């Protein structure tokens, strides 16, 4: 499996979901929207994902599974795929990072690294 990224770009936007959170019970809910852009010259398919979620206490949760939100999408050359999901933390701040396992039009698997991104209650950090 190749660890290079054949021109796949990941964009992440996060949001604290206040109406589903309960700070008194140490339950902080975050939504994230991810856009996967295929800047390569061929179609790719997202096969699986791996996430490492770390809260402010250093507690780590590892999540692995097929596809994203029940799908293993094909992303055509020059196209993009956007989905939203969420996670719960015990603290008002945390970090997510991970990988997508994908394959190209020839069936060659490769890994797309998802750089760490912050989950934080608004105005909690300076």
Curated annotation (Swiss-Prot):
InterPro entries: ApaG_domain (IPR007474), ApaG_sf (IPR036767), Uncharacterised_ApaG (IPR023065). Residues 2-126 form the ApaG domain. One of its GO terms (biological process) is error-free translesion synthesis. PANTHER family: F-BOX ONLY PROTEIN 3, POLYMERASE DELTA-INTERACTING PROTEIN 2. This is Protein ApaG. It comes from Vibrio vulnificus (strain YJ016). The gene is apaG.
């Amino acid at each position: 499996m190749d660890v290079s990224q054949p021109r796949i770009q990941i964009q992440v936007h996060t949001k604290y979901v206040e109406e589903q959170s309960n700070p008194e019970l140490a339950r902080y809910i975050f939504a994230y929207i991810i856009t996967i852009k295929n800047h390569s010259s061929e179609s790719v398919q997202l096969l699986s994902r791996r996430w490492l979620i770390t809260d402010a206490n250093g507690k780590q949760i590892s999540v692995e599974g097929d596809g994203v939100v029940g799908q293993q999408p094909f992303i055509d050359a020059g196209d993009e795929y956007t989905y939203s999901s969420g996670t719960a933390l015990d603290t008002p701040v945390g970090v997510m990072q991970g990988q997508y396992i994908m394959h190209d039009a020839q069936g060659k698997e490769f890994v797309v690294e998802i750089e760490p991104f912050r989950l934080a209650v608004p105005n909690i950090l300076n």
